[in-house]
Amino acid sequence: MNLGEFLYKLVHATEPYEFILHWGMYKDLLEEYQLIASSEKYTKNIYPMGLTDIINQNNTDFIPYFMSEKIFFLDNNIIHTMLNNEDVQVPYDYSIMLDTNYTSYIKWFLNGRNQPHLLENYMNLFSSGEDKFTVSNPKHLAVYENLYYVELFKSIDQKKYVECNKLEYTISENEARQNTDRIISLFYSGNSKEILNKFIDLHQSMTLLLIGIWQIQFGSKASAKNKMKKLFKYVIDKVGIFYEREMVIALRYLEDTKAVSMLNKINKGGKSLNQKELLEKVENIAWDFIVPRVMEFHVNTNKKYSYFIPFFLSHDKKLKELIKLFNIKGMLLHRKKDEYIPFSNLDTTDFFDKKGLFNELKTLRENEILLKREMVHEENINNNFSNKVKEIKTLHEILKK
């Protein structure tokens, strides 16, 4: 028995009792694990009252991470308690992530003024390697203001606003500034810097992958299947990391470009961009692609205290569509290690097999190729992903033809 077999069974499970049955079969292997899973056959909706109605509205800005509001939790202690016919008390909490443009709406809401602060402000701050934060830097000030207004927004007296339509805060403006100062100082502490570096590496790898997708889409007249074979090779040679959900999305795009509107932001015949502008545009799209992985990180970091249910709030239609393209059914988390494995309702091995790409997927997992991919990824990190300059040049030339 191994973890891969267990996850395969979870992908195909539909009834809550099936999850419990599979857990029981693998309980010795799962001693240090806990599970968050969703099933339409489960009877309980764990979302706050009214939120499901909001999520189900057309053009809603609320995007849930999990594919259903019918969510349950499992670990060996929960199973043991259930078998003893005792009440199961499971602590869980919620978090709402905002896209950075949404924070400008908050400032407008609180102040009646709108000064949009785009995602690149955050990227410039946290990926630039700067060791000092100062509000005399306009880009730093933009980030500070966004965080400050979010702190105020979080402290709105809900009862007063609902009953009297009046904005009052449960903290002072000075307390909001102090909270913001603490957040900024956390970003510059050793541990937080290490975490941010992981996200920056992830973002740069995603940038490389996206460049490869567009190189192949616009540089080849092959079928979607053969384009995908080229992309598998590109992953081995240039990226190193195999991003499963993004490769599924890439194939859907290569089969039908209309299926992934986010990837249509780069196209032939559009506005002429120089290489620097093109790279900046690709990097901004890459930030959107890693949103689900940031949500997963928050689920993992809070696992010691409670099960965590994340949501994302955005007014960007293409970003909302992108997040919904790969339904997350659940997540398996290790209690002590930094290990978490999200899984969907899609059997990706079967998916690629039916598309005639099983051999390419199998090749990725061969020991020799695994070693090569690891070396490619390490080299990318050590060279600060300098190869993206060459790859963006290639893409730029393809788009000009």
Where are the predicted features?
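Active-site-proximal, substrate-binding regions of enzyme catalytic domains
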Residues: 2-308, 323-401
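Extended hydrophobic secondary-structure segments that form protein cores and membrane-embedded regions
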Residues: 309-322
